[in-house]
Amino acid sequence: MVFATLGSVHPAQDIPFESPRDGWYGLKTLWFVAPSYQGPVLVRGARIDTEGAMAFGESPALGELIIPPGPTLNEASDGYRTAPGGTYVHDPGCYAWQVDGIGFSTHIVFSATTV
């Protein structure tokens, strides 16, 4: 389950991680960027209750997610920019995304649970 603050950038919520594939549990992650913020976004993450990695992308290949400034290919009609992708972890547990943009940095803590 994801507990997100509704700031400038946030993911979709309440989605369980899918069964492991190649040692990674995957979560389809759709990021929303508020119309009031048009700058770049950097998303990183890690497990916070013990050691553990997090990866991003369509497969667990990236150590971070970058949402470029300006319009996205699939911008919503209400002006929100969206960035689809995935978040991957090795084990269920407590994790956090760190979301950075120009003038802000926030942490979003979530519990990675399985289906």
Question: Predicted segments — roles?
Answer:
Residues M1-H90, C94, D100-G101, S105-V115:
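Contiguous segments within soluble domain cores/interaction surfaces
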